[in-house]
Swiss-Prot record:
Active site per the UniProt annotation: H234, C316 (nucleophile)
Source superkingdom: Bacteria
Annotated signal sequence range: none
InterPro entries from the UniProt entry: ElaD/SseL-like_N, Papain-like_cys_pep_sf, Peptidase_C48_C
Similarity remark: Belongs to the peptidase C79 family.
Record's function text: Protease that can act as an efficient and specific deubiquitinating enzyme in vitro. Does not possess desumoylating and deneddylating activities. The physiological substrate is unknown.
One record GO biological process: proteolysis
Organism lineage: Bacteria, Pseudomonadati, Pseudomonadota, Gammaproteobacteria, Enterobacterales
Keyword Protease: yes
The protein's name: Protease ElaD
Originating species: Escherichia coli O139:H28 (strain E24377A / ETEC)
Length: 406
């Protein structure tokens, strides 16, 4: 990869930046590691050079971006001043990018690469996650959040943004976290989070999922099934377990609905009751294979209204993740553990914490959840974005000058 260098770009205008592309050198793995070492020692030019390389779309651009991101994400007493330099550099680049966007210059090269100079700053990227922490304007944070989270369903439409410390988790964030902790689980399975109702219908996503699973596998469910469900601005966790009674040769589905509030509402409760009961009264009666009937006779439904959000009004999604993790981990230790018992014990234990302790538990979970999203789900989205840029623009060059412009 050939790259030209800009240093002290906080003092460059966008026009100067476009007109001073002279000195170039080859980026290598050895160079990146050397720059990382000198950047960690506080060398500002190394930090700025890493940012220039990070603007690229090839593997070195990604590696440089990772170096900066992981320094910021894992602060120590020794790196606090370094992190401030990195954040300042990111914000300066972002401000230059806005200048270029608002007052675009005529491209200077046939590959249109000047226009692409700051493309990564407006695409899903780890640079974007660093920038968002530093941007003071809420509206700009929200715009970046839409890109970073691919928020097509406007889950952040209440004025919150990705960097808010007290906001609801999105569908993708919850799914990413739960899939990670359930990846090697043998006794519990996690299903993709959904809304309660199918749009423009009284039918629920849960009944669709249950119907599809039973049709494809009459012995389903073999493991405990967890369904994160958004009832409309609020997340709950539905647990389904098949109980076998060998004495009378019957099988039963037990359903536990974990709700971190003190109530769910009669309409929503009735909808969920109808979903479970309909397997016996409606769906199973229409199945030609009568052997399936015994799987769902006399279902039992328990609503566990845990009332955990006295101090954490926007943490229903976090509670779904933490409660699901409790079930998954405990059932790996003891597969006979009943979901209701595990969820009840979790809720009772959490209530014993002081308000300060609850805040800290919630805060630490959100950090882990965010990092999980960025490392897994976010990386996939970022890599897809890079791939599209590479295909469309055929390896655009990093543009910058080796001269310090004052």
């Amino acid at each position: 990869m050939m790259v030209t260098v800009v240093s002290n770009y906080c003092q460059l205008s966008q026009k100067q930046l476009s007109q001073t592309f002279a000195e170039k050198f080859t980026v290598t793995e050895e160079l990146l590691q050397s720059l990382k070492k000198t950047a960690l020692s506080g060398d500002e030019e190394s930090i700025e050079l890493l940012h220039n390389i990070a603007l690229g779309y090839d593997k070195f651009g990604k590696e440089a971006e990772d170096i900066l991101y992981h320094i910021v994400r894992n602060p120590t007493n020794e790196t606090l001043s370094i992190i401030r330099l990195i954040k300042n550099a990111c914000l300066k680049l972002y401000n230059l990018a806005h200048t270029a966007t608002n007052f675009p210059l005529k491209p200077t090269g046939p590959d249109n690469s000047d226009v692409l100079l700051f493309k990564k700053l407006f695409s899903p990227s780890k640079l974007m996650t660093i920038i968002g922490d530093e941007i003071p304007l809420i509206s700009e944070k929200q715009s970046l959040s839409k890109v970073l989270l691919n928020d097509e369903n406007n889950e952040l439409s209440d004025g919150t943004n990705f960097w808010d410390k007290n906001r609801q988790l999105t569908t993708d964030e919850i799914d990413c976290y739960l899939q990670k902790i359930a990846a090697n689980a043998k006794n519990t399975e996690v299903n993709y989070p959904t809304g309660l109702y199918v749009p423009y219908s009284t039918r629920t996503h849960l009944e669709d999922a249950l119907n599809e699973n039973i049709k494809s596998d009459p012995s389903w469910p073999k493991a405990v099934q967890l369904f994160p469900i958004n009832t409309g601005g609020h997340w709950i966790l539905v647990s389904l377990q098949k109980i076998v009674n060998e004495k009378n040769n019957t099988q039963q589905i037990k359903c536990v609905i974990f709700n971190s509030l003190r109530a769910l509402g009669h309409d929503k409760e009735n909808s969920l009751k109808r979903v479970i009961n309909s397997f016996n009264s409606e769906f199973m009666g229409e199945m030609s294979n009568n052997n399936i009937k015994v799987h769902l006779t006399e279902p039992e439904i328990i609503f566990l209204h845990a009332d955990l959000q006295q101090y954490l009004s926007q943490s229903c999604g976090a509670f779904v993740c933490m409660a699901a993790q409790e079930v998954i981990e405990q059932r790996e230790s003891n597969s006979d553990s009943a979901p209701y018992t595990l969820l009840k014990n979790y809720a009772d234990r959490f209530k014993k914490y002081s308000a300060e302790e609850q805040y800290e538990i919630d805060f630490q979970h959100r950090l882990v959840n965010r990092n999980c999203y960025l490392d897994k789900y976010g990386d996939a989205r970022i890599n897809a974005s890079y791939t599209q840029l590479e295909i469309k623009h055929s390896q655009p060059k990093n543009r910058a000058s080796g001269k310090r412009v004052s």
